[in-house]
């Protein structure tokens, strides 16, 4: 499971709130003899550095919405290397609240859905 934190796309970080503490999820996944989960939190650029867009930026060779690219790269990294820390790169669920939930929805629909995604489940909360 990977988590994308919220914060209105302008604030936050992977360890910056109590909702980011995975201990309850991990304990619940091990209850009753369950094998548990691997929990990975990611960071991404925020504010103007993460979400600038427009024709002037693109004409100057800039990348619009770099925060989404940061997230996509991190998700792809988790899928590629999950096996190195006991996970299954073919069984990734994204969890996110607020801007994190919205980001999950953006990842699903990015590129008109033509590029696909490297995760198999999504839990967008209050996007």
Predicted regions and their residues:
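Serine-hydrolase-like catalytic core of hydrolytic proteins
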Residues: 1-127
């Amino acid at each position: 499971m990977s988590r994308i934190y919220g914060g209105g796309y302008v604030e936050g970080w992977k360890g910056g709130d109590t909702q980011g503490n995975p201990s309850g999820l991990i304990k619940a996944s091990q209850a009753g003899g369950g094998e548990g989960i691997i929990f990975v939190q990611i960071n991404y650029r925020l504010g103007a550095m993460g979400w600038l867009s427009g024709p002037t930026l693109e004409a100057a060779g800039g990348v619009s919405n770099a925060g989404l690219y940061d997230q996509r790269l991190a998700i792809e990294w988790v899928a590629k290397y999950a096996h190195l820390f006991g996970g299954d790169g073919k069984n990734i669920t994204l969890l996110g609240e607020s801007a994190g939930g919205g980001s999950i929805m953006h990842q699903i629909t990015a590129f008109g859905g033509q590029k696909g995604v490297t995760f198999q489940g999504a839990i967008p909360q209050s996007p």
